[in-house]
């Protein structure tokens, strides 16, 4: 077996490049890594244990909470509160933010926003799911309680972001603002190993990912772009391939590696978009830009520039290969 760098070693090496680093962000990533391993274990035995299906409640979005949603949320919350470097958590599964009020946590510099199990409705049919996370420095004074304003920061202020995809293998992909790197979990060793160094999103691709079942509800520009993707034009490699899993992490991960575009636009049923700005759009937009791609909420509207006004704010999302995103926005800008 080829020896490669583990996630822990990679984090330490990266930390050593910054003489003023305190190690707190590294400790935060250790918490995410630990919770990811625990969720990986449960996802992999979902067909054998009584953790599939709905938990009997709704989250703040009005969506049925799946049992694994609740489980993953609790495990990430426990792991992130344990080390005292995070002062608060906002989760798609929580009505409001969660303040960690232990004495060490009050001194914590960071807040974390998380979708603990994206695409969990697919668990029952054995489709890949994932965790999405976003990290910010708190803007309130350390030593005091975390505030709502600590979470309502634009995506440009993210210190780090990433996701874990639980599929045929489990992979953690993250960025701290200097490129994107991916680590594949080796269950025999219990470690994440560097498998995708300096990931780059191709500027062009031949995959478009959109829920075409909602076509009738889409704005005319999106409809025109979908037709453009379906037209035959050999010089440009069209028609493109349609691939839509229904799990943002899985669709984004594929398009990041192979090149492609993911669209979840506004619609007559979701006039503000459906995806959550803070838990889904911002972290994925951060990764896309770090990998050379683009992420827009509309024409000339980068996702990362949006100033949020509420925790569970929704946003449209057009993300992926830069030239494909630009082309989609050409159609959106047509009168």
Swiss-Prot record:
- The UniProt record lists the keyword Protease: no
Cite the binding residues for substrate.
118-121, 211, 244, 262-264, 274
- Has UniProt tagged this entry with the keyword Magnesium? yes
Q: Report the top EC class in one word.
A: hydrolase
Q: Which residues bind Mg(2+) 1?
A: 92, 115, 117
The record lists the catalysed reaction(s) as: beta-D-fructose 1,6-bisphosphate + H2O = beta-D-fructose 6-phosphate + phosphate
Which family is this sequence assigned to?
A: Belongs to the FBPase class 1 family.
Under the heading HAMAP family, the entry gives: FBPase_class1
Q: What's the protein name?
A: Fructose-1,6-bisphosphatase class 1
Tell me the organism: Teredinibacter turnerae (strain ATCC 39867 / T7901)
Gene behind this protein? fbp
């Amino acid at each position: 077996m080829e020896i490669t760098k583990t996630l822990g070693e990679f984090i330490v090496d990266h930390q050593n490049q910054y003489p003023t680093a305190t190690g707190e962000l590294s400790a935060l990533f250790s918490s995410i890594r630990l919770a990811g391993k625990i969720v990986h274990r449960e996802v992999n035995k979902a067909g054998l244990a009584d953790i599939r299906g709905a938990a009997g409640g709704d989250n703040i979005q009005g969506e049925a909470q799946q049992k694994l949603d609740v489980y993953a949320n609790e495990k990430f919350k426990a792991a992130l509160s344990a080390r005292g470097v995070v002062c608060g958590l906002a989760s798609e599964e929580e009505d409001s933010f969660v303040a960690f009020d232990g004495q060490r946590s009050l001194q914590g510099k960071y807040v974390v926003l998380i979708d603990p199990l994206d695409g969990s409705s697919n668990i029952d049919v054995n489709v890949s799911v994932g965790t999405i996370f976003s990290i910010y420095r708190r803007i309130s004074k350390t030593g005091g309680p975390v505030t709502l304003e600590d979470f309502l920061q634009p995506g440009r202020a993210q210190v780090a972001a990433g996701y874990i995809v639980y599929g045929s293998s489990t992979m953690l992909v993250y960025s701290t603002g200097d490129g994107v790197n991916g680590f594949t979990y080796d269950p025999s060793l219990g470690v994440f190993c560097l498998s995708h160094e300096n990931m780059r999103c191709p500027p062009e691709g031949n995959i478009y990912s959109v829920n075409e079942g909602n076509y009738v509800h889409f704005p005319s520009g999106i409809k025109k772009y979908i037709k453009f993707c379906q037209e035959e034009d050999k010089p440009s490699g069209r028609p493109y391939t349609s691939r839509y899993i229904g799990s943002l992490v899985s669709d984004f991960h594929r398009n990041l590696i192979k090149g492609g575009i993911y669209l979840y636009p506004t619609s007559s049923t979701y006039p503000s978009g459906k995806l959550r700005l803070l838990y889904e759009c911002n972290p994925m937009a951060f990764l896309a830009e770090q990998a050379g791609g683009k992420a827009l909420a509309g024409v000339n509207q980068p996702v990362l520039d949006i100033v949020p006004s509420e925790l569970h704010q929704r946003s449209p999302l057009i993300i992926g290969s830069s030239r494909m995103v630009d082309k989609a926005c050409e159609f959106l800008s047509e009168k």
